[in-house]
Amino acid sequence: MIIQDLASFIEGNIIGKDSFFDDEGFTGRFTFLNDAIDGDIVIRHKINDKGVEIAASKNLACLITQNPQDGACDKAIELNFPLIIVDKIELATAYALKWTIEKFSPDSKNVIITGTNGKSTTSHLIYHILKNTESHVLTNTDSESEFNTLIDPMVSKLISDEVKNNGKLDYLVIEVSEVQGWLGNLMKHHAYLMASAVKPCVGVITNIAMDHIGLVNSIDEVFDEINQVPNAIGDGVTVLNYDDDLVMKLTPNNPFLCSMNKFDSKNPHVYYDDGIFYEGNLILENNDLPFTSHHFIQNILSAVAACISLDIDIKNIVEGVKSYRPLNRRFSKLHENPLIVDDFAHNPDGIKATIAETYKLLPKNQTLYVVCSIRGSRGVEINKLNVEALVESMNDNIKLVL
């Protein structure tokens, strides 16, 4: 690859040297500045003159940025160092992901998971089931949700590092934010862009609900962001939550339906009826499930459906679900007596579901105390909707602490 091709792919302009800095070209990987070595490419949302100096001193192939600051361009010209400036940094991160998978994991079967709620739990459960088959699996899901935004080259770095350190991957399980932005600006069709880069053979769409207010301001806008994801999945299998009306408006080529209801005109492939059924046969009893709450059982259904679509043996899927231990802050029981539940719910639907499911666990007439932290960084509008969700969930036996 020559630098002009790279700049063309990501719709960028080259400042400074019009070829890669090292005569050998791009010989490394996409990564971060502090971790980069000779021949690597670094993607940063913003870079200053000092950053360009560091990149040149490390003999990097080039830098890619959306926001050059404090003399970065002048320094690139002075050092004759290639700096590619883009209008959309997401094009660079998507290209980095695509290139990395093609180079380091060309034979893996890839799964993407997107939607408003349940992405992390579904992704982590799929990862666990696959790992339980003794396959080599990588996921970008973690309990702090630090690696699932795909707005920087972290996942590309994770993939290349994992393959270099531990060998060939069998599966990639990639969580994709349904809506993404930077500095208050929507990265339009982010989910489609990243899903296309992964080239999944299976995709999961959990639900479509409001979150990320400010980047999107209506449920129609959320739908527009997710609507193109089935196109990225193409002829692969798209696992759909049949109980979500908006999800069922999507038109994938090869849908796989999962539902919390047994009987339906379209006959969901996997459903819950005091246990999980596949093709009418009970495969997991209630006591086998790691979750008892409605919304988390939906995540189990999606994970089971995804693994069936990957041709994983039902016995291995069952063993994986039975042995699963949830991520931190996903309806985690911190204490039994008194009952204390910790959950990461951070949008209206998630908050309502968490309160409703926790309330079901209480003995009759016992008081439920809901302690909720409102994060200022989330924005005024989403916080307003979250508070409204809290208020709507209240009854005489629920007390709220903000």
What does each of the following model-derived ranges do?
Residues 55-59, 76-78, 195-199, 229-234, ...:
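Short, conserved loop/helix-junction motifs that constitute active-site signature segments
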Residues 92-240, 246-254:
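Phosphate-binding loop of NTP-binding sites
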